[in-house]
Amino acid sequence: MMGQNQTSISDFLLLGLPIQPEQQNLCYALFLAMYLTTLLGNLLIIVLIRLDSHLHTPMYLFLSNLSFSDLCFSSVTIPKLLQNMQNQDPSIPYADCLTQMYFFLLFGDLESFLLVAMAYDRYVAICFPLHYTAIMSPMLCLSLVALSWVLTTFHAMLHTLLMARLCFCADNVIPHFFCDMSALLKLACSDTRVNEWVIFIMGGLIVVIPFLLILGSYARIVSSILKVPSSKGICKAFSTCGSHLSVVSLFYGTIIGLYLCPSANSSTLKETVMAMMYTVVTPMLNPFIYSLRNRDMKGALERVICKRKNPFLL
């Protein structure tokens, strides 16, 4: 009987964003512009790091993977949202919904681990500059990236398999713009306690601990910089750390609020807005905060442009 109930749901209906019909076109144009900005910004970073040998360093290895993760993270949800806004067809097949959830978790978790690796890289570079090359060896950097991919793959698969075992009966309306894990659990008509416990326990390992490690790394960085009597260096460091921490806090804060500390009286509108912060806004901001405004990336862009104009220039 349970298997029959589960297979009775062949698709889900995504309600999308709670916007008025007269605002549909404006919102579509806005989200399309944000998505294209995310794609172009992150693709530019990946291409520049690939083409410029000056950027073949640990920090830019992490940045290129972060850009790829951001690009994919947005592509998991935004194209479907834009499609639904255009053709007014909110349905998504059951298998596609679980697939979307899997890749959403995969690239979201991957970003979490990569942000930790980048914070550690900056911590070593600023606090132990003389030992940076020895500590951040190519083997360690590749191992950190590979470990991030492996852990996130298994974590996303765990949640997807746990979700696939649940039964979904009559209600197939998801009050969200993508197949969110918490929204799907609310629709299940079977026991979800195992899923909820796994979310809470694994969430602490995947989200809370990385967030605390990042805060600790930047705290040590600030402490180290304050010991140097240079007002210009202090201002620059606080500007950089402040911008990084603002994006990190936006990403982790919304995820912790939604999945680990959900409010009993939280509205669908509030949850949707919070989800937009880390699915749309953060991937769009990351290229500008971490890469495109720094001197190395600007220099790489100039060198690539010069080579295009003069192919014989070394």
Curated annotation (Swiss-Prot):
Q: Which GO terms describe its cellular component?
A: plasma membrane
Q: Where in the cell is it found?
A: Cell membrane
Q: Extracellular topology: which positions?
A: 1-25, 80-100, 159-195, 260-272
Disulfide-bonded cysteines = C97-C189
Q: What residues are glycosylation sites in this protein?
A: N5, N265
Transmembrane helix as a keyword? yes
Pfam families, from UniProt? 7tm_4
This chain's function reads: Odorant receptor.
Going by the entry's taxonomy, the superkingdom of the source organism is recorded as Eukaryota
Write the protein's name. Olfactory receptor 1E2
Which key words tag this protein in UniProt? Answer: Cell membrane, Disulfide bond, G-protein coupled receptor, Glycoprotein, Membrane, Olfaction, Receptor, Sensory transduction, Transducer, Transmembrane, Transmembrane helix
Give this protein's Gene Ontology molecular function annotations: G protein-coupled receptor activity; olfactory receptor activity
